[in-house]
Amino acid sequence: MPKNYTPAAAATGTWTEEEIRHQPRAWIRSLTNIDALRSALNNFLEPLLRKENLRIILTGAGTSAFIGDIIAPWLASHTGKNFSAVPTTDLVTNPMDYLNPAHPLLLISFGRSGNSPESVAAVELANQFVPECYHLPITCNEAGALYQNAINSDNAFALLIPAETHDRGFAMTSSITTMMASCLAVFAPETINSQTFRDVADRCQAILTSLGDFSEGVFGYAPWKRIVYLGSGGLQGAARESALKVLELTAGKLAAFYDSPTGFRHGPKSLVDDETLVVVFVSSHPYTRQYDLDLLAELRRDNQAMRVIAIAAESSDIVAAGPHIILPPSRHFIDVEQAFCFLMYAQTFALMQSLHMGNTPDTPSASGTVNRVVQGVIIHPWQA
């Protein structure tokens, strides 16, 4: 695998494809930069992480919010720190429920543009509510409000990731995965760094290479009307992001849903019919994987869906009993690493499904009612 991860040319001529393809290279660039910033990061973070009762909230809007859903569970268990994921869209509407003035707070704000109204307002509300509040924005846009406000603040460390991750396409692709990798490297450098993460970059590069010019589609083409992504733990966050990619790039022409395998039985399974594609992200953890495989086998026995596809790192009798994708060979991946692999398939599927349905992936909202940077938000001042 070439060390610079040179991406293949975009066969579709879209920014979205180009941005999907350059992800492995962007990750290593960003993590190499974080290696260089390690001393400065430690100077900022180490005193904070020693604070008793420190809360660490991962926040963002839309796709940027799902970063926290994917990585916060692992960061909390791995570091023993109080990580949680709360969208800016919840922080802004209900600050009194999430911002506790009695505990110090580190707010990690993710943003592609750094200009979403809720993201800017969440920082201001956190400062207003919590006397001892600190900020670590991770953003793709040097000119964005998140970054510019942070570099002029004495309670913040601004982390800028490579400019090419400021996706020009409508949907966030390289931006979400590079912000994910960067945050993991900041808080778990012994596990996620520019050297160890090459295994993830290599595997994802192999996935993209295996898909050729993307024209055959990831899951083939069929007249499905619905898609459901399922994943356990942090992989439910990856499932949520995968579903949003389909909704965004097809402009809602293909209905998309997400859940956990165990949660899916509790009502949502009702949506499965003979026009439904179900994709199960199979966990790499041997305990969790049992639950994923139980549901996979059940869905196939039900014989209600048009197709049920498993994506897994290794095969088994249950996986191999129906349509499946086995990840390219590599070392054992924990689920937070495996999420990057699953997103390669999901992003590519959404792109090609968009084109297949006659959409323009870079500007999928023909009506203009859904925007790349959200519009129409009125921020109401908090008055205690």
State the predicted function of each range.
Residues 1-5, 138-140, 222-227:
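An N-terminal domain-start capping segment
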